Each structure stands twice: as C-alpha cells, then as structure tokens.
Swiss-Prot record:
L-methionine binds at I443, G444, S445, E496, D611. The gene is metE. GO terms for molecular function: 5-methyltetrahydropteroyltriglutamate-homocysteine S-methyltransferase activity; zinc ion binding. It comes from Pseudomonas putida (strain W619). Its cofactor is Zn(2+). Belongs to the vitamin-B12 independent methionine synthase family. This is 5-methyltetrahydropteroyltriglutamate--homocysteine methyltransferase. Zn(2+) binds at H653, C655, E677, C738. Pfam families: Meth_synt_1, Meth_synt_2. Keywords: Amino-acid biosynthesis, Metal-binding, Methionine biosynthesis, Methyltransferase, Repeat, Transferase, Zinc.
Length: 766
C-alpha cells in the first residue's frame, strides 16, 4: 500500500488572512488573542483541506507567524542579545516580530529598544526569504518556544494523523551566520543536538509516530566535514522513540546519495521533479527496511501533474518496495498558491492546465490510490482527464506559436553581439550624448504616491476613462521631469508612474502570459507576491513603453532613458512553463524586449536601461551547473540589447551584493553602463570590478534608498572618491543604489540635491 502524505502547506490562507491579521496586529488594530485565533483557524482549515483532498499523514509545524527558520531560532533559543528580554524571560510573539522587523529607536517593547532586524535571504533557489539565524562563538541552545508541541496537540484534538516537520540540525546550522568572530558553525553541533533530542522525545511523548526532518542541504555541494557530521548526528537522534523521515528537495542528491540512503533513519524523501534521474540509483541503494517517499508532484509550480507518467514510476516502485512506498509533492507546497477553486475569471481550458496546493494534494492522493486500487473508477477518470489535458497542451495553438518558434530557431550568433567593441561604441556615445564627467542619473522609478495608485486602480475598474488615465499619468511624468530638471540631473527618467510592478507591467502586454486573481505566494512575513504564469510562446504584439517615454522626452532637451525589465528577471519572477526549457523561454522574452529596444531607438531615445535584478537569483544550487546557466542568461541579455546602433547606450541595473563569482558573466553581458548597489558596503563591492579590470562604465550606488535617512553631500563625495580609487573616473556614473518607488518625495528630493552637489564637487576638483 502506498501512503499519501504532504511535506508542508501554504500558511497565508486562501484570501491572505494571515497577512491581513499580521498587519492589523502590527498597527495595533488586532490584539494578540485575535491574531492567535486567526492562526488557529487557518491551521484547522488547512489540515481539513488536506485531509479532504486525501492526504493521510498531515504536516504539523509548517505554520509560522513570519518564517519557519525564525520559528526554529526561537525554539532553540537562538535569540540575538539585542532582542532578549529582561531576566531571561521566555520569548513572546513580540520578540519574534522584533527579530523579523526590527524595533525603532525610542519605541518601548517588552523585549528591546532600538534594534535592527535579522538579515533576510533567499530560501535556496526559491523566491521565498528566510531570516538568517545569528550564531555567536559561545552560543547556547535551550528549548524556548512551545509552538510545535501546541500545534501537535491541536491537530490531534481535531482527530488528524500528525507528522511534525522540523528543519534538520545540519541544515539549520548551514543556514545561519557566525557573528562576532571567525569560527566554524559545525563546532556548535554538540550543543544543539541535545535540544533536538529533547524535541523528538517530547513529540514521542505526545503520541507522534512519524517526524519529518528536512535536510535540503543534502542536494548541495557540501564540504567533506559536513558530510562526515551526518552519520554522527543521526546516530544520536535515532535514540528517540519515534520514526524519522529525512526529507530532501530542490534537486538531486548526486554524490550525497549513498550518504542519504544509509542514514540511520526510517525513511527518505527525494525530489523526482527536479531530479528524476536519481530514481533507479536510490532504489538500488536504499536499505530493505526503509520507507522511500517519492516527490512526484511539483511543489514549486502551478501546472497540473502528468498523472500517467507519475503512475508509471509509482507502479514500478511499488513492485520493488511494496508497503515501503510513500507519495508526496516534490517539496513543501509553501511555494504554491493555495486553491485554484478561488479562480473565477480564468477560462475553462487554461484553468484545467493548472493545480494549486489543494489540487496538488488531490493529485498526490490519486497517485497513491492508483497503486493501491488500480481498478478504481476514480483513478481511471483522473488518468483520462490528465491524458486529455496533456494532449491538449501538446497541440494547443494558444501555447505553440510557429512564428515565435521560427524566430527563435533563426537566431544567429551575430544577433547577440553589438556592432562594435565597447571602446569604439563609447567614443561615439560620448560624442553624441555630450554628458559632463561624473554624469548623474537615477535608477528609474520615482515615488508611487497614493494618487498614482488610486488612478491606476480606478482605470482598471473602469471608473476612469483611458483619456483621463493617460492625462493623470502625463501629469505625473511632467512633475517628475520638472523636478529632475530643477535638481540638475544629467540623464532623466520618466518615473514609471504607469507601472504597478517591474514584471507585471510588461507581462500584461506580452502574448503567452496569464494572470491569476488569487495566485498569491508568500515571499516573506506578510509580503505576498502573485507571479504571472507563462503558459505559451512569448511575443510582443505592440510597443509597451514607447508612447510614455516619447512623451517624457518631448518635455526636455536633456537625455531621457528608456526603462525595461530584462528577460532573465521576467522569467525568474514568473511561474515558468514546464514543457520547454528556461533557456528557450528566456530567448523568447529577449526577442520581445529586443523589439521594444529597437522601437525606443527609432523614437530617438538615446539611452535604454534593461534591468536584470534577478540575474544572480537564477544560479543553480550546484556550481557544476553554473556555466550552462550563465551562458544562456548572458546570451539572452545580449540578444535583447544588441540590435541597436553603436551610438545608443545600453544600461543595466543589478540590485544585490555579491559579484565576485559572476563578474566574468556580468562583463560578458556587455552593457555600456552597469549601475549597482554598493552604498551599504562602503564601495567594497567594487573590488570585484577592479580585480577583474571590468572594462565598461559603472554607476556605483552612492546612497541606500532602503533607508529614509538623507545622506549628506560629504558622505557621497567620500564614497565617490573611494570608487574613483578602484574605477577610472571617466568611467564612473553617479546614482542612487536602486529605484525610488518606495520613498516619499521630500526625502527623495533632499537626497538627490546632495547627490548632484557631490558630483559637481568632484567635477570641480577633477
């Protein structure tokens, strides 16, 4: 008999109830009892939804008030000194939210005064962010937070078969950072393990039969000493009197396969969506007593599973494993929207191609039933439906566009190369643009005021005519251009008032994208995103930005930048297709953006910026796979940027803080100017560009837009002088480190006044 289980369920709620409750609590509009009730109701609803879908063993402990790693930090007592209560008091929900969000100076809280939040970073290669644990050399661990045990009691009281979910000790340590000294995090292991042992024994005392221990770092390139630690850790943890399932996901085990298969635990979960090739080897290597959980339903995307293909694997596995076979999604469904049933405006055909978390649980249950009751009418009907969906998608003219495919096949190497080398281009650009030394510009967006958002909303709802909406946006553009001229900026932007989001704005205008109404997923805390879905071949029916930029250019004699989002970022921040490669989708996007770049050039726009905020995010988890990704990602950028004349200057913007290991690929993009985020690192990031001898022009961000603080002219002069020690002055631009969309106008203007003054001071002393 195959058993249907789940690794984790989205916590936000069908209508983002958790987000709304969190934000009401932070504003003081909801008390703690009210917040806790929302959490309790959501957990009960989610467990019931999974049970109704046919899941037999339910994940418990996957709920978090902000982030699951942060929950573990509280559980283990890993609470930085700045958040600790008086006299060793137990942490509270206020402590948890303070660690996540920081505490403003002067605000009284029962745990801390002014304290900056913990660092946040990407959860492996997903678009979810976790709060990075902070470890000190003398770090002590102690069970300090009862949430897991309370939730197990809740689930059992509701009559559910509960499988608690905990992050494994080695993955938890790997995810954290050593603070205040150079020490090896592995040295903390012996202090941490007794807490795990205590947790497992308490769960056993609650009547728990199985616990899921997540060890996703087993799909990474691990140092030998971390590999060596695994067997020792699980030899210690096996003493606890309950069964343990080690869960791996987001990739294949590769050289860690033997290690994972032979850990002294009762079961192993593997991801067969990301790494189907590991299936035969794991089947041969798994000890005869051990459960094998096969992740066959994609937990990270929105497409309906090809049930027939999955059933073939399962029936083969059942012959070998018998009752030792479990079925699950590939990973936690945290990364999937909640319930496709909420979507009331998708057309029937397209909706039939999709599956959200509830539907993925139903798919898992049907797969288990296909093994256990192969002749059941329900199984036959589900397989027939799945076959029809797969056949329909394979031949649908909505998906497959011969003209787009022909254009991709016709791409020649020369299409992704500029006409001349940078040295020749820049000479022509300088002559044509006639900019001063240390030219000043901004990254693209200006403050999105309530008036802008209201106008956009009214237009979408049909309450504002198109003519009135265009005039409202023109008014905002006039305002932005006037302010920039008054400030004395050299290269202007139109301010992006008409754009809701840097991906959504373009996706709405491209064929091959569709939008859901309720396809929300958690990014972090209360922040939810609703990625667009790429369902078919991508193309641009008509110009997307030209009218706005042309209008802005008509208001000034200064140079106006065109502003676009690059192909890699468009892809990374969407739910991609599964029937063609990411490389193919990136090329289709690149061709669509290339058309827009050429239209901007034809409209006499002399500078076009193509943002690639997510370029680094696309890097695979294993370094061996980096070269292939970097090759197609840089080629996609060059393809969208290389159709223009030498005289047209291409800019790109990247907002992250690690360039050393991808600097060659950034150079290979061959943008004439790259603007980057460097202010918080005090220009140290430029070391990578200096060492590599980066040949093109650079705009290192001279102030941090994420802070409302207005930096002084002197600070920016100092940063620019530092930059000029690493990068020749004639190749330096002066700009903030990111777009100004989230800031208010007064602080924006004040900061830009000082930035322009700093550039002028440097020109005067050059």
């Amino acid at each position: 008999m195959a058993l249907a289980h789940n690794l984790g369920f989205p916590r936000i709620g069908r209508d983002r109830e958790l987000k709304k409750a969190q934000e009401a609590f932070w504003k003081g509009e909801l008390d703690e009892a009210g917040l806790r009730k929302v959490g309790r109701d959501l957990r009960a609803a989610h467990w019931q939804a999974q049970k109704d879908a046919g899941i037999e063993l339910l994940p418990v402990g996957d709920f978090a008030w902000y982030d699951q790693v942060l929950t573990h930090s509280l559980t283990f007592g890993v609470i930085p000194e700045r958040f600790r209560g008086h006299d060793g008091a137990k942490p509270t929900l206020q402590t948890l939210f303070a660690m996540a969000r920081g505490v403003a100076t002067g605000r009284s809280a029962n745990c801390c005064g002014g304290a900056h939040a913990q660092e946040m970073t990407k959860w492996f290669d997903t678009n979810y962010h976790y709060l990075v644990p902070e470890f000190t050399v003398d770090q002590q661990f102690a069970l300090s937070w009862e949430q897991l045990f309370e939730e197990v009691d809740e689930a059992k009281a509701l009559g559910h078969a509960a499988k608690p979910v905990v992050i494994g000790p080695l993955t938890y340590l790997w995810l954290g950072k050593a603070k205040g000294g150079d020490f090896d995090k592995l040295e903390l292991l012996d202090r941490l393990l007794p807490v795990y042992d205590e947790i497992l024994n308490r769960l056993a005392g609650q009547g728990v039969e199985w616990v899921q221990i997540d060890e996703p770092i087993l799909v990474l390139d691990l140092p030998q000493e971390w590999k060596n630690a695994y067997e020792r850790v699980y030899n210690i943890l096996q003493r606890a009197p309950l069964k343990k399932l080690v869960a791996t996901y987001f990739g294949g085990l590769e050289e860690n396969l033997g290690l994972a298969a032979n850990l002294p635990v009762d079961g192993l979960h593997i991801d067969l969506v990301r790494a189907p090739e590991q299936y035969p080897t794991i089947l041969d290597r798994l000890p005869a007593y051990k459960i094998l959980s096969l992740g066959l339903v994609n937990g990270r995307n929105v497409w309906a599973c090809d049930l027939e293909k999955a059933v073939d694997v399962l029936r083969h596995a059942a012959e070998r494993l018998g009752d030792r076979l479990w079925v699950a999604p590939s990973c936690s469904l945290l990364h999937s929207p909640v319930d496709l049933g909420r979507e009331d405006q998708l057309d029937t055909e397209l909706k039939s191609w999709l599956a959200f978390a509830v539907q993925k649980c139903q798919e898992v249950a049907v797969l288990a039933k296909a093994v256990n009751q192969p002749d059941a009418a329900e199984v036959a009907a589900a397989l027939a439906r799945s076959r029809a969906i797969q056949a329909g998608r394979a031949s649908s003219p909505r998906i497959h566009k011969p003209a787009v495919q022909a254009r991709v096949h016709a791409i020649k190497p020369g299409d992704s190369q500029r006409q001349s080398a940078f040295g020749q281009r820049i000479a022509k650009q300088r002559a044509g643009l006639n900019l001063p030394a240390y030219p000043t510009t901004t990254i693209g967006s200006f403050p999105q005021t309530p008036a802008i958002r209201l106008a956009r909303q009214a237009f979408k709802q049909g309450k504002l005519t198109e003519a009135d909406y265009v005039e409202a946006m023109h008014s905002e553009i006039r305002h932005a251009v006037q302010i920039q001229e008054n400030l004395g900026l050299d290269v202007l932007v139109h301010g992006e008032a008409e754009r809701n989001d840097m991906v959504e704005y373009f996706a709405e205008q491209l064929d091959g994208y569709v939008f859901t109404r309720f396809g929300w997923v958690q990014s972090y805390g209360s922040r939810c995103v609703k990625p667009a879905v790429i369902y078919g071949d991508l193309s641009r029916p008509e110009a997307m930005t030209v009218a706005w930029i042309r209008y802005a250019q008509g208001l000034t004699r200064k140079v106006m930048k065109g502003m676009l989002t690059g192909p890699v970022t468009m892809l990374m921040w969407s739910f991609p297709r599964e029937d063609v490669s990411r490389e193919t989708q990136a090329r289709q996007l690149a061709l669509a953006i290339r058309d827009e770049v050429l239209d901007l050039e034809a409209a006499d726009i002399k500078i076009v910026q193509i943002d690639e905020a997510a370029f680094r995010e696309g890097l695979p988890l294993r370094r061996s796979a980096w070269p292939a990704y970097l090759e197609w990602a840089t080629e996609a950028f060059r393809l969208c940027a290389s159709g223009v004349r030498d005289e047209t200057q291409i800019h790109t913007h990247m907002c992250y803080s690690e360039f050393n290991d991808v600097i060659e690929s950034i150079a290979a993009m061959d943008a004439d100017v790259i603007t980057i985020e460097t202010s918080r690192s005090d220009m140290e990031l430029l070391e990578a560009f200096e060492k590599f001898d980066y040949p093109n022009e650079i705009g290192p961000g001279v102030y941090d837009i994420h802070s409302p603080r207005v930096p002084s002219r002197e600070e920016m002069v100092k940063l620019l002088r530092k930059a000029a020690l690493r990068i020749p002055a004639e190749r330096l631009w002066v700009n903030p480190d990111c777009g100004l969309k989230t800031r208010a106008w007064p602080e924006t203007e004040a900061a830009l006044v000082n930035m322009v003054a700093a550039a002028r001071e440097l020109r005067a002393t050059a």
